Amino acid sequence: MQVIETLAQGLKRELKVVIPADEMQARMNERLVEVKDRVRINGFRPGKVPVAHLKKVYGKSIMADLVNEIVREKPTEILTSRGEKSATQPEIAMTEDEAEADKILNAQADFEFTVAYEIIPPIELKDASGIKVTREVVDVSEDEVNEQIQRIAESARTYESKKGKAANGDRVTVDYLGKVDGEAFDGGKDEDAELVLGSNRFIPGFEEQLVGVKAGDEKTITVTFPADYPAANLAGKEATFDITVKDVAAAAPIEINDELATKLGLESVDKLKEIVRGQIESQFGSITRQKVKRQLLDQLDELYQFDTPERLVDAEFENIWRQINTDLQQAGKTFADEDTTEEEARAEYRKLAERRVRLGLVLSEIGEKAGVQVSDDEMQRSLFEQLRQFPGQEKEILEYFRNTPGAAASLRAPLFEEKVVDHLLTEVSVTDKKVSKEELTADDEGDEKPAKKTASKKKAAAKAEAGEGEEAAAPKKKAPAKKKAADESAE
């Protein structure tokens, strides 16, 4: 076998691989001898079929199998012998000329193919001891815990039907039918809808007109959908709602005590406070972690500058760009609304894609040299976490991860990355700084904010993660039930 390098430009490589016809013939003969005792051909005793006859009957199919094996296995062997790693799956090209292909299958011509790929650039690890990060720490106050428990108590409060008029804070149960220009519209009908007056869960003007109603009342109200309402056919439109009031209920007083804790499945209010404090600390800890990680990645990005494989950057950019356009569409906005143009946004997100790929390669190299491993138990826990996120789809999710190439890698990648970050935090200078909740949660996008206002851009930029073009490969969640048009939700 002969390997000839035909291209070495930047990170791009192309090799020409030539396997002489006599070598292919020898391989085929070996394979024919292996199958000789197993084949059954009429007119011949088992094991007595002449090799020449076997070649005539099975030669081309065996040669085709050999060709497939070679193009599947040899590129990896060749790259290993050259001390190279391909950034993506190498592209293999063979002759498309049928006559030439037939000669190869009959061992009458050399088998030639090309291997095109981009190498992962060699990365010389640098001393990280000069990196300094600040870890913001928030002390969870008693007031913070009590406020959260108050919210929990409000969500768990009970209501008792009452006679008389509905007031703010009461829960009304209604049937309603919405119309625009006298015609009912999709999503404008509901039965036994429960609404706490004053919660601002429905569109503006809806709840206010129900203050004072009583059980059994029938009423028609007029409202105007907000100009930025997600459903374009309703945005800015005046609508009427025919309402039947089925029940008015007053809220029971909120009492934060052991009885509330018991209702929530806990033994005491002290245990409730302990759990709530832990949840708040965990939430703050996650924010702290992300901000520390951002500082670390920013400084690593300054330390390492090298060319990135174009195909990896292309794949990462497509992931980002797809998300940006989805977010803009859902927000009903355009690039012009965000004081930018599509061309400018593309350029900015291309830079972000390059950064992600570069950091991914750096973290991968650091992790490999440090011996960072993701255990089977960690992978199993990550898979279970995925299953919890998609209730009712557990079987589908399992099948996805079993049968989809790269799916397991999508679970491993973030686990590996976080473990590498943990390793780096033992080598860099970390200074704790006590801050307020407001300071911790203040928007901090740093240099990764590619444009001025776009919420979708915040989502993309905030990740700055070290993927290698393999962003989440998990199946999409099923779409939630369609929201009623009147219900804006308090989310």
UniProtKB/Swiss-Prot annotation:
- Write down the EC number: 5.2.1.8
> What GO biological process terms are annotated to this protein in UniProt?
'de novo' cotranslational protein folding; cell division; chaperone-mediated protein folding; protein transport; protein unfolding
UniProt GO molecular function = peptidyl-prolyl cis-trans isomerase activity; protein folding chaperone; ribosome binding
Mention any one GO cellular component term assigned to this protein in its UniProt record. Answer: cytoplasm
Q: Which residue ranges are recorded for the region named Disordered?
A: 434-491
Can you give the residue ranges of the PPIase FKBP-type domain?
169-254
Q: Which Gene3D superfamilies match?
A: 3.10.50.40, Trigger factor ribosome-binding domain (3.30.70.1050), Trigger factor, C-terminal domain (1.10.3120.10)
**Cross-referenced PROSITE patterns, in alphabetical order?**
FKBP_PPIASE
Family (UniProt): Belongs to the FKBP-type PPIase family. Tig subfamily.
Quoted from the entry, the domain comment is: Consists of 3 domains; the N-terminus binds the ribosome, the middle domain has PPIase activity, while the C-terminus has intrinsic chaperone activity on its own.
Q: Describe its function.
A: Involved in protein export. Acts as a chaperone by maintaining the newly synthesized protein in an open conformation. Functions as a peptidyl-prolyl cis-trans isomerase.
Q: What is this protein called?
A: Trigger factor
Q: Which organism is it from?
A: Rhizobium meliloti (strain 1021)
Q: What is the lineage of its organism?
A: Bacteria, Pseudomonadati, Pseudomonadota, Alphaproteobacteria, Hyphomicrobiales
